Amino acid sequence: MRLAVLTWNLYHGRAIPPAGRDLLPDFAAALAGWNWDLALLQEVPPWWPRELAHAAGAEQRLVMTSRNQLLPVRRLLAIRRPDLMRSGGGGCNAILARGTTIAEHRRLRLCRLPEQRWLHAIRLASGIWAANLHATAHDSARAAREAAQASAATLSWAAGAPAVLGGDFNLRRLELDGWDHAGGHDVDHIFVSGPAPTSQAHTLDHGSLSDHAPVMVTLEG
């Protein structure tokens, strides 16, 4: 089975330099225009995944992360002033799956403080598992522990089935037991257990959207 996997930190829906407006249509158009089967997304405004999935013709699952109290108020302010609100607008991580069916969704809280960090994963109808992580920033030891926890949990859920683990690990270099590094850029990585990359991972042209580059790799197996 051939599978194109994308990981992208959306920077809470912001741009560099600041755009001063709601960028949901821009991010949705970018994602819809790229040729992927799985998109692992971090720092996503919580009201975005459904719209992103609709634009891309995909299914979606999300896990709420931090700063989501009084979300309707946060949403209103973040839509009007995204560059002022930044992460204060609330956040989630999301997985989008295109051209297939999501059969199962699981999640695991990795820590509560200083911010909630979650692993979440989907099982596709084909049996492949795909897991999404955004690890703690500015604390390499904690980020490494969270990556190890995420690695072990995903392998346990997959129970020998092919699996993908990707996201923003907040580590430029790392190795995970039981996984092969399929590729990455800066702190964003994609690991595989079973499938093999058919070509080198590469970044996509994202213009001014986000402070992270989208990373894409095609897998087979």
Where are these regions (language model features)?
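Extreme N-terminal starter segment of soluble prokaryotic enzymes
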Residues: 1-7, 128
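Acidic/histidine-rich helix-loop elements
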Residues: 7-23, 136-140
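Active-site metal-binding loops of divalent metal-dependent hydrolases
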Residues: 8-10, 44, 133-135, 167-169, ...
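Active-site charged/polar residues at nucleotide-handling catalytic sites that mediate phosphoryl
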Residues: 34
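Active-site neighborhood of phospho(di)ester-bond hydrolases with catalytic His/Asp-centered motifs
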Residues: 39-42, 61-63, 164-168, 191
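Structured beta-strand-rich core segments of catalytic domains in phosphoester-bond hydrolases
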Residues: 44-127
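Metal-dependent phosphoester-hydrolase catalytic domains
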Residues: 100-111, 141, 145, 152-164, ...
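Metal-dependent phosphoester/phosphodiester hydrolase catalytic core
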Residues: 127-128, 133-141
